[in-house]
Amino acid sequence: MRQLIKAGIFTALIVVGAWISIPLGPVPFTLQVFFVFLSAYVLGKKYGTLAVATYVLLGAMGLPVFANFKGGAQVLVGPTGGYLFGFILGAFVIGLLAEKKESFAWYLASGVAGLGIIYALGVFVLNFYVHDIRKAISVGFVPFVWFDLIKLVVAALIALRLKKLEVER
């Protein structure tokens, strides 16, 4: 029950992270991915993925939980839909790997693997809208990757600290 409550809290944090948005062309800059990382690191593959999948499902049902207060299935089939589905698969992979070993280097490696999945799906879908893979990469990857790597590092540090506090309790 405790893990379900934590998953619900992380779903809410992902929503808040989506609402903190700076429009940059077809893909806005948000804090969603930061909370996707954090949920996967802290909750692991099962509950981290549940938190992210719940977020995507709430948006698909029409609740305005996505970036720029958008919601509805049209967002999932739009230019940023690949990133949203990538969040689910990325959270699973990050959580799966993070459960194997609790170390900063391992968390970074698992985060990079998850981020790669998020970007691969995101750019793949975005390409269908911009009709040019180079443009999809230049607008859906290049402006964000360094910021997302910073978010990954911060999420890993926070997650390790939270886990240490939980063990000490």
From Swiss-Prot:
It is a multi-pass membrane protein. One of its GO terms (molecular function) is biotin transmembrane transporter activity. The chain crosses the membrane at residues 9-29, 47-67, 75-95, 106-126, 139-159. Keywords: Cell inner membrane, Cell membrane, Membrane, Transmembrane, Transmembrane helix, Transport. One of its GO terms (cellular component) is plasma membrane. InterPro entries: BioY. It is found in: Cell inner membrane. Belongs to the BioY family. Forms a stable energy-coupling factor (ECF) transporter complex composed of 2 membrane-embedded substrate-binding proteins (S component, RibU, BioY), 2 ATP-binding proteins (A component) and 2 transmembrane proteins (T component) upon coexpression in E.coli. A stable subcomplex with both A and T components are also isolated. This complex interacts with at least 2 substrate-specific components, BioY and RibU. Substrate-binding (S) component of an energy-coupling factor (ECF) ABC-transporter complex. Probably a biotin-binding protein that interacts with the energy-coupling factor (ECF) ABC-transporter complex. Unlike classic ABC transporters this ECF transporter provides the energy necessary to transport a number of different substrates. The substrates themselves are bound by transmembrane, not extracytoplasmic soluble proteins. This is Biotin transporter BioY. It comes from Thermotoga maritima (strain ATCC 43589 / DSM 3109 / JCM 10099 / NBRC 100826 / MSB8).
